[in-house]
Regions:
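Conserved TIR/SEFIR loop-to-helix hotspot centered on a Trp-containing motif
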Residues: 83
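Short acidic/glycine-enriched loop/turn segments that link adjacent beta-strands
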Residues: 86-89, 172
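Short histidine-centered catalytic/ligand-binding loop motif
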Residues: 91-97
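Active-site/acyl-donor-binding loops of N-acyltransferases
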Residues: 166
Length: 183
């Protein structure tokens, strides 16, 4: 039987897919918790979070509002330049420049003020830092190890031209909707 601490009710997330890191992120997800592997072939495990947690049960008006916001934003490029670690031990790929992603997050957060990025956890520090989660520091995981493992994939240029609505939950991860930027 699952321990309560190992189970998640889940959350809605607005994300931008990062295909170049998909294989790595899927492998690391499988290493830690296979229940977060999606069987949905359109689901992007490797992603840049744009806004999460988002509306728990979005309606037609919520989806339309996201579409309106994204229609006003043209596609833009970012580069995943290097591996770094946040103070909490989250090892990630740094996205530079990050102004396009920050702007996208600000626009969506303004459209949904009851759903601040990461629940408002990073408001005092200027907002969340756009990144792709790669791993977490631990006895067998160092930043140097992750850098050596993904070094051949970085730097990587990425065109952010789509935002997906994803459901993240144990054994239920899936893509629910997708919007093109500037469309």
């Amino acid at each position: 039987m699952e321990e309560a601490s190992d189970w998640s009710a889940g959350q809605m997330c607005l994300t931008a897919p990062v295909p170049v890191l998909e294989e790595w992120v899927v492998a690391r997800t499988a290493h830690y918790d296979r229940s977060f592997l999606s069987t949905d072939p359109t689901f992007a495990h490797a992603h840049l979070t744009v806004l999460a947690p988002w509306v728990p049960e979005p309606g037609v008006a919520d989806l339309a509002r996201v579409g309106e916001v994204l229609a006003a934003v043209p596609a833009f490029e970012v580069e995943l330049t290097r591996v770094a670690t946040f103070p909490d031990g989250l090892v990630h790929a740094v996205s530079e420049p990050d102004h396009g992603l920050r702007s996208l997050t600000r626009r969506l957060a303004a459209a949904f003020p009851d759903h601040p990025p990461y629940g408002g956890r990073y408001d005092a520090t200027g907002g969340p830092v756009p990144h792709v989660t790669l791993d977490r520091l631990g006895p067998d995981v160092t930043e140097e190890w992750v850098r050596a493992e993904v070094g051949h994939l970085l730097p990587a240029r990425l065109v952010v031209d789509r935002v997906d609505l994803q459901w993240w939950g144990n054994d239920t991860c899936r893509r629910l909707h997708s919007w093109r930027l500037g469309a």
